[in-house]
From Swiss-Prot:
Gene source species: Methanococcus maripaludis (strain C5 / ATCC BAA-1333)
Subunit comment: Homodecamer. Pentamer of dimers that assemble into a ring structure.
Family of this protein: Belongs to the peroxiredoxin family. Prx6 subfamily.
A cellular component term, taken from the record's GO annotations: cytosol
GO molecular function terms listed in the Swiss-Prot or TrEMBL record: thioredoxin peroxidase activity
Keywords: Antioxidant, Cytoplasm, Disulfide bond, Oxidoreductase, Peroxidase, Redox-active center
SUPFAM superfamilies per the UniProt record, alphabetical: Thioredoxin-like
Function of the molecule: Thiol-specific peroxidase that catalyzes the reduction of hydrogen peroxide and organic hydroperoxides to water and alcohols, respectively. Plays a role in cell protection against oxidative stress by detoxifying peroxides.
Transmembrane segments: none
Lineage of the species this protein comes from: Archaea, Methanobacteriati, Methanobacteriota, Methanomada group, Methanococci
Active-site positions on this chain: 46 (cysteine sulfenic acid (-soh) intermediate)
Identification of the protein by name: Peroxiredoxin
Coiled-coil positions: none
Amino acid sequence: MVVIGEKFPEVEVITTHGKLKLPEHYIEAGKWFVLFSHPGDFTPVCTTEFVAFQKRYDQFRSLNTELIGLSIDQVFSHIKWVEWIKEKLDVDIEFPIIADDRGELAVKLGMISPYKGNNTVRAVFVVDATGTIRAIIYYPQEVGRNMDEVVRLVKALQTADKGYATPANWPENDFLNEKVIVPPANNMDARKNRLEACKSGELEGYDWWFCYTDLKE
């Protein structure tokens, strides 16, 4: 089972867009990707999730991030389901869906729980442009995902790459609003510099270990 900080396993997958090599396909394009699993095609909760992901697809792309789905259904089932969504709900699913019909990748990624049958749970993997797994979330089969939180997670991880941390409920934190946290000082000189930066107005803060600032683009 993989963990945060590990490289995404190298695999070749069959998708609704043809064969893809992961994570190579996205690394070569210099893109992040969000891989998410769903329990099964032609199921109500999964259908609502796919529509919700598609409606935010442009938002993910603006973050240099692609989407790719996965279940243990066959590719023919994926194709018919995507056609059904277009016909009945008038939504074009533009991102690929992996047909992991033997469950090999799902098992490797810890998407199948022995307590939840043979179908995948609702997993989310955020992978950066180097192929490193940056975040993993698991939802039970009976609970649909919050897509705004997945978008927020990608934004927060990309903000972390700029050297900042993000507070609870960012960018709507009760105290800091959209401001971001400067990592705590780790020695006495840095502590002194932080206090001086807060005093001069270069940073804001409650103490030397709790400093924050506006996010600089």
